[in-house]
Curated annotation (Swiss-Prot):
GO terms for biological process: electron transport chain. This is Ion-translocating oxidoreductase complex subunit E. Keywords: Cell inner membrane, Cell membrane, Electron transport, Membrane, Translocase, Transmembrane, Transmembrane helix, Transport. The gene is rnfE. The chain crosses the membrane at residues 34-56, 68-88, 91-111, 127-147, 181-201. One of its GO terms (cellular component) is plasma membrane. The keyword Electron transport applies. Belongs to the NqrDE/RnfAE family. It comes from Buchnera aphidicola subsp. Acyrthosiphon pisum (strain APS) (Acyrthosiphon pisum symbiotic bacterium).
């Protein structure tokens, strides 16, 4: 396994939110601030990692014709367990995420990776696939959530005590004065615009890198011909 290619594919090249555009409903609904984005991203990553590992462990005994219902049973069991843990230990985060915790069961990313990777790959590969696909999605959610929070409320990391309970609720950064904020950013249309902006930036970076790579190859081939 090429580790660099493995990481690049999952974190950047085939990012589930910025490239495959999977699971956009929770991405846009729960990224009104950075903390909610981190909370949902961590929960999704945990579900991905656990379900991938379980499905890969039992892949040889899961009947091919019944695999989708079995995936859903495993995923729903894992999500329910994590939901109960969030309710018990991080109640504020549980309240903020609300209905979007159980809706992780229907997230296309989870089912897609289960069938594409976990059902066909080793436990180790499936485990790390879950981690890095989840981190890639969390990175996108965090970027969208941070920009929306800064533009819409002028703050960053407001409500950090939802994740780290011993932090006081007054601990956050104020980056913009209220009179300079753009209220559209915290509403769904603003979320769509910011997500589109991030996708455009990613595509620009990819295109720039591709052009430079082609230019370097052409220069190398020309220098070899001269020699």
């Amino acid at each position: 396994m090429n580790i660099k290619s493995f990481l690049n594919n999952r974190l950047w090249k085939n990012n589930s939110s910025l490239v495959q555009l999977l699971g956009l409903c929770p991405v846009l609904a729960m990224t009104t601030n950075a903390i909610n984005a981190i909370g949902l991203g961590m929960t999704t990553t945990l579900v991905l990692t656990i379900t991938n590992t379980i499905i890969s462990s039992f892949r040889k005994i899961i009947p091919k014709d019944l695999r989708i219902p079995i995936y859903m049973m495993i995923i729903s069991s894992v999500v329910t367990s994590i939901e109960m843990l969030l309710h018990a230990y991080t109640f504020n985060l549980y309240q903020s995420l609300g209905i979007f915790i159980p809706l992780i069961v229907t997230n296309c990313i989870i089912v897609g990776r289960a069938d594409l990777i976990a059902y066909k790959s080793s436990i180790v590969e499936s485990f790390f696939d879950g981690i890095f696909i989840g981190l890639g999605s969390m990175f996108a959610m965090f970027a969208v959530g941070s920009i929306r929070e800064i533009l819409g409320n002028g703050t960053l990391f407001f409500g950090a005590n939802k994740i780290i309970s011993n932090i006081h609720s007054s601990v956050f950064f104020t980056l913009l004065d209220k009179k300079f904020t753009i209220i559209l950013a915290v509403f769904p249309p603003g979320g769509f615009l910011i997500l589109g902006f991030l996708i455009a930036i990613k595509n620009f970076i990819d295109l720039y890198y591709k052009k430079n790579t082609i230019k370097n190859i052409e220069q190398c081939s020309c220098s070899n011909k001269i020699k």
